[in-house]
Amino acid sequence: MPVRIPDDLPAAGILESENIFVMSETRAANQDIRPMRVLILNLMPNKIETETQLLRLLGNTPLQVNVDLLRIHDKTSKHTSMDHMNNFYCDFEQVRQRNYDGLIITGAPLGQIEFEQVSYWDHIREIIDWSQTHVTSVLFLCWAAHAALYHLYGLQRQLLTTKCSGVFNHSRTQALHPLLRGFDDEFYAPHSRFAQMELAQIKQHDELEVLAQSNEAGAYIILSQDNRNLFVTGHPEYQKGTLRDEFIRDSQEGLNPSVPCNYFRDDDPEQDIIARWHSHGSLLVSNWLNYYVYQLTPYDLSDMSATTPWEHKK
């Protein structure tokens, strides 16, 4: 959240140059405040686990957030009871006419399937298209990031011979950027996917900006030029044991998975897990919600043309 200061305070320029968010008294006095409305399209198999992970991050901000859970209307969940889905999830037709401050679309275990072969691909495209006029900012995670980059910008992904699984070191590509405020120069984030998009391909696109990347995992944080779409190719929401559970599941299914990199102590699955990413994940979602949802969204959600463009120094 911003620090409110007098309009002409000399410290303002210094703080802004250090990437500290300050707000003049004039702007603060004219700022309307209300709860943020966030929609979550949950594509992960274990709905309750993913709900908990995302709500934990959203709840770690000073903003009040009202959350709606969205499902694919014609898909039956194999790992979550129908009672849970009917009680807590809505169908797209129920929200089609609404506007939201934020939308989160999760990953999905579909990394080895071509997008057009996904049974609900047309519905995913419909929701992505709808979000561009009904949501202030969209956060795409893992598979959803690749799917949206493909659908919106025509970028192609490459299937990997072995799964990219582990906790990898990342670096910022910019020293000053609102989304990266508070980030260390290097930080860790989990990845779990069977595909990757070439870093060079993304950087060549004029409408996209790579904000963080990894030598091992490639582009990690990508932002659209209009600030509406944020693509995160990893899983900052994962809890401590999620990669372990996936490793055990894949082993039991006879997939002979590699041990997740840099996750178990000494890369030994018999040893303890070292969680290195929780603070980063919390900060990433907090920055997104503050700078690209709360600061940009109109007070009156019925008028999405009133979004405030965010300007930052590169």
Swiss-Prot record:
Pfam families, alphabetized: HTS
Organism of this sequence: Shewanella denitrificans (strain OS217 / ATCC BAA-1090 / DSM 15013)
Enzyme Commission no: 2.3.1.46
Q: Where found, per UniProt?
A: Cytoplasm
User: Record's Gene3D superfamilies?
Assistant: 3.40.50.880
Q: What is this protein called?
A: Homoserine O-succinyltransferase
Top-level enzyme category: transferase
Which Gene Ontology terms cover its molecular function?
homoserine O-acetyltransferase activity; homoserine O-succinyltransferase activity
Q: Which positions does the site annotation Important for substrate specificity cover?
A: 192
**What family is it from?**
Belongs to the MetA family.
Associated pathway: Amino-acid biosynthesis; L-methionine biosynthesis via de novo pathway; O-succinyl-L-homoserine from L-homoserine: step 1/1
Q: Which gene encodes it?
A: metAS
Identify the InterPro entries for this entry. Class_I_gatase-like (IPR029062), HST_MetA (IPR005697), MetA_family (IPR033752)
Q: Which reaction does it catalyse?
A: L-homoserine + succinyl-CoA = O-succinyl-L-homoserine + CoA
Alphabetical GO CC annotations of the entry are:
cytoplasm
Function, as annotated: Transfers a succinyl group from succinyl-CoA to L-homoserine, forming succinyl-L-homoserine.
Q: Which residues bind substrate?
A: 163, 192, 249
